[in-house]
């Protein structure tokens, strides 16, 4: 429902580049104009296929980067929040998954009652007068947008948490659904959430996966990720979990380089490096 490809942690990207990696940061279609599976998931799976089919290398060469080659044996997926879920979605129901996945506090375990439970700390931010005829204008957006300048917790592209702009139907719609425990029914209406839940879709042979999650997360509680890791272990998938003390949701956008949080979350990227470094 929210976000765009510019809303990333620049220090994290710089860390990836320093490791000699090529970083691709896509936009995708936003719910609810299209559902989760047929919009964001499909778009990211198409991107993965494009990389494997030589599209990325061809694009780089067209940009004058003829000396750059793409090692398709070392493709990895990384994302935060909804992007963490999308990274995980590349591990199943695709012809060729990535080598490894790094999930930062991604949305998972959709059968848990949390996903239909109202969130008072979000509801208290909603102003009066958000009538359906206003917030439902989000369904009139044509074409389906791929860009929203605010994140799940109201963070702007700078990483500052200024809060949503409720004069915009999309912001009002998204935060109303979050506040009332209706995110999944709004973004995957009339469908079985088990179709898209990584907890339900993990199978033997799933890519090696690292999960990084803030212990104080109120938007996607850490116990949801713990269940994912439990299932990964049960299926024999190589995995690791990094629990970051004192951090709430979307902490990656505001952390300071060199802080305890910075050093802890880097273990996720170290995990990726270990996996792709194997012969």
Locations of regions flagged by a protein language model:
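Alpha/beta-hydrolase superfamily serine-hydrolase fold, recognizing
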Residues: 1-279
